[in-house]
Amino acid sequence: GSSLKFTVGKNKYIKDRGYAFEKKLSENTNHILNVQLKDFKSDEAQAKVPLLLFNAVVKGDGKKMVLSTQPMSFMMKPFALQQDTSISPDAVDFAALFKNQQPMNLRLLSALRMNATFPYVLPNVWLPASPVIDVMDAGLRDNFGQEATLRFLDNFKEWIELNTRGVL
């Protein structure tokens, strides 16, 4: 029945433990996280708020899925290997992959859950691809975010040197 589904925009989804988790997290944070990626995209692009970067792991192949409001294709391979065509990317840019499915409509609560979907505690998140892609906790590949941090810093090394006093 309809009580087993919920709607975001024009899309309907099944209520499961993931839905219950997101609902409770929203309640516990006074609904401040109940926004969509598109709601802070402009502020991030203008550097009014920090850039949020979320990671998940694609269960089928172990690739990292990078979620952000800004283009992240530069994060798909280590910086030193970006020009090496013999090495395939080991990550996927969520917004680029789902460009036809309104990726900026993703709720921040869902991005947080995708980043922290620990097996058996929460169900994997199933994404609208063919074949279906399911993702889980990013900790499988990069529990502390070191890989993502180093890739990001490597890509912006020159900019950081020219425009900041450094990175702690």
Language-model features, listed with the residues they occupy:
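Catalytic domains of lipid- and phosphate-ester/thioester hydrolases
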Residues: G1-L168
